[in-house]
Amino acid sequence: MSKKARPRIYNRAGKRIEVQDKTWYALQASGEASERVIEVFVYGEIGAWGITANQFVQDLRAMDDGVSPVIAAFNSIGGDLFDGLAMHNALSRLGERCTGRIDALAASAASVAVCGAHRVVIAANAMLMIHNPWTYAAGDADDFRKVADVLDQTMEAIIAAYKAKAPDIDEAELRRLVAAETWLTASEAVALGLADEVGDGV
């Protein structure tokens, strides 16, 4: 790894699958002006091979009137952690008018992103997955030690994102679940505080 390169930290379930179609997310506004709801669909990987945080934020800003409710719907295996964190923070800044909706899967970086919403509703047959960040590396021993340090630091960012959503969660238990790569059912996610409500889905 180049000593000047920023490591790309992944938080993604499974191996990356190359596809050509990049239309993996969409935004739409529905209803009259007084009852307008903005829906953001994040369906696919997060990062340069799918939807980047820059695209997400710029498109959301173009539609957001500062008043209407925003629903961010997720079906994503995750991707680039830093893009996920940026999405998390963008949703958090919307405050109480933002709802995160897990339609099928919010894994890895997507689980970090959706937890930025004020309220999270998870479909009864959906899942949320949490695990350690990971990356690729090359270089000498010093390079690998530096990469390990960065992974430790990004782990703290992940824990902080989950704790912001679920402040009452036992941190030791949270760290154990993250380290073990844990797949949570809808009811388990609600029990932990990472989701607020089980929605439709079956």
Q: Where do the PLM segments sit?
A:
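N-terminal organellar transit peptides
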Residues: M1-A109, G116-V202
